[in-house]
Structure formats: structure tokens, C-alpha cells
Amino acid sequence: MTSLPASQAWLYVRNNSSFLVKRNGVQFSREPGNLTQLNTYKSSGLCNDKAIDINLDEDGKIVMALKAPKRATKPSKSLNKTPLRKNFRRSAKAIQSQTAGKFYRGDLTGKALARYAALHRFTKVQQGLAKKAKTKTGRRGAVGDDDEGMPSLT
């Protein structure tokens, strides 16, 4: 099976895509592999052979997915997903080594790091909001907690 050339695929996808979102005269794209979320040929994850996607999974964890050019004819198997569970610096270094080490476009590394930083900041805020504040319901022996006004049993 032969694959469609990237430029021809873009002609089909650019105006008609299930990932396309048009708001206030600007076209956005929610497709996997599109780091900038703009509907352009350069940032399209569907049309390019090598693409990077950094997103949250169902559990709220950050996952990096790399599109493998070897599996271009099998879209369901073309993404290699890697969870980014380490601290910020190690995960950023993993993103750099995966993109630069496998000869992805140079501009994708900076965009991937920017997206990872934004998602990392978002998850930290979400973790902070998820914690409930501890409230003390009452203490024994606190001031005003003696049994005034109660009849004595003795």
C-alpha cells in the first residue's frame, strides 16, 4: 500500500477535517501531533511524516507521542507513546533527546518544550486545587467548651 504525499494530503485536510475548529476568523486544529494547535501545513500532525504530540492522558498525566515514519501506512500503530513521569528537568531532557536524536525538525523541539512547560504548570495547579483544605470541626477542652448551663449529674 502506498501512502499519500504530504502536500496532497494537506489539500484534502486543510478545509475539511473533524479536528478543525473555526473561531473569530482563525482556524485551529485539535489533531494529534499538532503542537501549536494552528491549522497550517507546517504544524499539521496528519500530513507530516514526523510529528510530536504532548498531551494529557485520561488520568491527567503528561504523555509524549512520537509519530514513527516507518509505520506511515498503519496509522493506528504509528504513535509511540512515552509517559513523562520524572521531574521537569529530566522530562525536558527526554523531549530534547527524543526529538533531536531522531532528526525531527529543529523548530519542533522548542515548541514541544513550550507545550510541556504549559501542561506541567497546568497539572501542578490542578493538583493544588484538588487538595481539600483541612478544617477542624472542634476540639475537646477548648475555651467555652466546658459544660456551663448543664445540670450536674452528682
Per-range role (PLM):
Residues 1-154:
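Compact, Lys/Arg-rich rRNA/RNP-binding cores from ribosome-related proteins
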